[in-house]
Amino acid sequence: MKRNHPTNNSPATVNKTMNRRTCLATLAATAISRTLGAGTTPPPKAQIAITLDLEMSRNFPTRDSTHWDYEKGNLNEETKRYSVEAAKIVKQSGGRIHFFAVGRVFEQPDITWLKSIVEDGHPVGNHTYDHINLTAGKVEDLQFRFQRAPWLLRGQPLHDAIRENIQITNAAMKNRLGIKPAGFRTPGGFANGLRDHAAPRGILKELGFDWISSLYPAHPYTMPKQKPDAKVVDGIVAALAKAQPFRYPDGMLEIPMSPISDIGAFRTGQWNLEWYLDTLKACLEKTIDQGLVFDFLAHPSCLYVVDPEFKAIRLICELATRHASKAKLTDLNQIAAMS
């Protein structure tokens, strides 16, 4: 009986050959993919926080408004309304604003507006009681108010005065809002953060803070009322690299503020709104493209004057929503938890 031996063209041989070719092609494609993919891992999702400092700002609503230096917490009605509306806008986009309040805000008789913000889920952090300078070298340089009324310090040494100013803000928040502060932001931003100021960091750790926001990176500015050219904008965007979270040697986490702040743009630069929005957009696009952390720093007491239609905040929400696969709105507590 003649047996049928498979020939080179038989189905069995063809299938074996095709299986071998398919396997080799798959292995080759995988190797090529790995080779091409080396070093091109997609960046992490960008984390975009909107932070608003609740204080009054020198030079707003008018350039000659300087009395706020002595009453930083005496918020006017416009500032309160802007804060409430901004919180609603961001919540509608699925985000939260991280507020930082100076303690003197809690001396005002009616803070129902701030309670409503807290009840809507927006965190509020400690911004010291009197908007003091934590890097001051002597006690009289802590704040304008103490230069005018030094007896308020009761002869305290520098670091005791700093500790008390932070501590009584914690107490005020507990008493008036029933909450603990959601982190700490220094009044003013420093190009080196608190790297050279271990004592204030130690005070903050002692008071229970495990993250702070104190660094604002150096970047180019324009002359007053001068439109920022491409070189200035590129310099501001480049400064984002210096505004990423890091830890100090003592373990304290720093979450820097991102450029450009509203005070830098509108007080120092005296920019118009469109220049500011264009620069903000460039910073956000870089943040989203590279998966960076972005901490939008602004003050309702400034924004209600220069941006009454909330264009900056709406721009942030719009870009985060449009690029939802690459970016998300968040707050500094969540950034800290992921750092």
Give names to the regions the model predicted.
Residues 43-123, 131-133, 180, 185-190, ...:
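Active-site beta->alpha N-cap acidic-glycine motif
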Residues 143-151, 186-287:
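Active-site-adjacent pocket scaffolds in enzyme catalytic domains
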Residues 84-96, 147-192, 209, 255, ...:
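CE4/NodB-like, metal-dependent polysaccharide N-deacetylase domain
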Residues 31-43:
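Bacterial Sec-dependent signal peptides at the C-terminal "C-region" and cleavage site
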Residues 75-80, 100-110, 132-137, 159-162, ...:
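Acidic-and-aromatic substrate-binding clefts and catalytic sites of carbohydrate-active enzymes
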Residues 3, 8-31:
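N-terminal secretory signal peptides and thylakoid transit peptides that target proteins
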